Amino acid sequence: QKEYAGDVTFILTDVAEGEGITSLDITDIDAVMSLVLAQKPDVIINCAALTNVDGCEKMWDLAYKINAIGPRNLAIAATAVGAKLVHVSTDYVFAGTERTPRTEFDTPDPISAYGKTKLEGEQFVRQFAEKFFILRTAWLYGDGKNFVKTMVRVAKTHDEVSVVCDQFGSPTSAVELAKMIHFLEGTDNYGIFHATCEGETN
C-alpha cells in the first residue's frame, strides 16, 4: 500500500516480476541465507504458502516444503541477522468443527494437509526465530483472486451455482491485515496473534 511507501522498502514479493524484483525459493536454505545476509533486513514478512487445500492433500511433499521448511529457513535467516519475522498463518491450524471463535491459547488440531503443514511452519518459526509474530488469518480477500469475484464470474456462465453453506468465518481484508502487520512489526510484542476482521458470515 502506498501509505507505507515512506518508511518501508519492499525487497521481495511473490506476485510481481520485473526490474527491481528479486525472486527467492524459500525452500532453499542456501538461497535464503545468501539473500538475507546480503540485504540484512530489519523485518522479514512471509506471505508465501501453498494455500490450495485440496492440492496440499495430493502434493504433501511440496506443501511441507513450502509451508513448513520455507518458514523454518526464513526463521533461521532472520535470527542470523537479528531481524524480526512476520509469518502469516491460517485458521486451518484448527479443525474448524467448533461454532465459537478460537483463541491464541487454544490447542491447534488441524485435520487437513494444509493445516498440518502450516502448523509445522508455525512450530519451526517458534523454534528458530528469536523475534517473531505469527498472524493467523482467515478468509483473506483483496484486489486479486477472491471468492466473491469467482462467484460473480461463475454466475455469469451458470444458471445455478452450488457452494457449501455450513462454514462460518470472518472475511478479512488484505489491506487490514497489512495494517496489522505494519503495526506489530514496529513493536516488541512477539508471539501468536489471531488477525481477522470483525463480523461473521457463511
Regions inferred by a protein language model and the residue ranges of each:
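Rossmann-fold cofactor-recognition segment
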Residues: 15-30
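NAD(P)-dependent short-chain dehydrogenase/reductase
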Residues: 123-171, 175-183
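NAD(P)-cofactor binding segment of oxidoreductase domains
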Residues: 44, 58-86
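NAD(P)H-binding glycine-rich loop region in Rossmannoid oxidoreductase-like domains
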Residues: 26-66
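Catalytic helix-loop patch of NAD(P)-dependent Rossmann-fold dehydrogenases
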Residues: 65, 70-73, 84, 93-135, ...
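Mid/C-terminal beta-alpha module of Rossmann-like enzyme folds, strongest
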Residues: 180, 187-202
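N-terminal Rossmann NAD(P)H-binding glycine-rich loop of SDR-like oxidoreductase domains
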Residues: 1-6
